[in-house]
Amino acid sequence: MRGVIEDLDRRRAEAAAGGGPRRVAAQHAKGKLTARERIELLLDPGSFEEYDTFVEHRSVDFGMETSKVPGDGVVTGWGTVNGRAVVVFSKDFTVFGGSLSETHAGKITKVQDLAMKIRAPIIGIFDAGGARIQEGVAALGGYGEVFRRNAEASGVIPQISVIMGPCAGGDVYSPAMTDFIVMVRDTSYMFVTGPDVVKTVTNESVTAEDLGGARVHTTKSSIADMAFDDDVEALLQVRRLVDFLPANNTAGVPEWPSFDEVERREEALDTLVPENPNTPYDIKELVAKVVDEGDLFEIQAAFARNIVTGFARIGGRTVGVVANQPLVLAGVLDSDASRKAARFVRFCDCFEIPILTLVDVPGFLPGTAQEYGGLIKHGAKLLFAYSQATVPMVTVITRKAFGGAYDVMASKHVGADVNYAWPSAQIAVMGAKGAVEIIFRSDIGDADKIAERTRDYESRFLSPFVAAERGYIDEVIRPRSTRRRVARAFAMLRSKAAAKPWRKHDNIPL
């Protein structure tokens, strides 16, 4: 028996060595951890259960039959994050550059199936060069199997992709179909075709960083949801993200102990909104005063900064936060902000995460660039997302809620359950100045008359009590009481039941 156990230990040590000391050293020299080191950091100590440790590829072309490493370039299994089960796979760049073979794909699909079976989140760590070209179409078939499972798991279990090195070619499409993409600055890249191919085909010279680095994908393409400085920070933040998420679409939001009293009143909120309606303020100050311990985990913080999206807790339970940001473009909705918020709202609705919407929106951004870029359809995405959502939704209007943007931002008309407004709220088709200049165009040359008519319009149409009189606002509240009101509303809505007509699926305006 001793000999058998010694053989097992030898085989495990061989698998754990990956591509060998030289390649591991090269990985560390780039500031990157190995596949196994990443899993150890991501999961609770001692919780990782590895599967398919000894799987090897079956390729016999191009001399591959003499080049085999146990595990075949990906480490798979399951473990826990703060005691909650998660499934994980981590591509090993030290073995065949982490490239995907038929058996490599089989290991991934096996744990994808496991995640669906136990209804637990799955986290994929990517550091690879794409398909293993020695296997040809077999590798492509493997990709297809992975992609199909990504689609089947969507909306059933949370899927998180962590890009910690190159992610090119077919490898990019699996992360693109997951719920969240995390990148590491300076060491991670995502692109369909790399700089060399771009140069050959288009004669365009571009670096890997400028083509598909973390900065590009967090600020321009919106492919990535967040980026961090190194592997350690990224994995610790993924652990934090997992803590906010339900295990699956029927598990309910996680609840953590909170020592932040839900009855807490914040006097500072009574003076948060400036007297001048054109003076900006930071909506994150309001978020910090309303949620537990001021803790907001932002999603896509560097993209479309005129709207804020992220996870927080109220009364220890996860909520999704969507908030216009007056500090950036006055909080206006544009194509990027609409897409960003729509995707976030859809995710929350998939996983029964209640949504808190904080509104200060002067309308949609005008201009040819927006219209040519499809603002109508992008704005409709957010409208569609809110209209289809069945989770508890609470809305607070702090200042402006003008035009179609008022409807879009979780108004009572599109299905929000509880709608509050601060006394500073202005709810109308447009601001007083613009409205008066249209209605009383003939008086534009008379400054005194325009000023008088503007004051009259403000008193008659911009007051939140006009909307409250019609039941569009459930209550006009003191700003200091916002946390208490919101917390009690969400507690009341826990038993919410909502029915939608049967359909195979909806047809969101993509």
Predicted segments with their positions:
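Ligand-binding clefts of soluble mixed alpha/beta catalytic domains
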Residues: 1-510
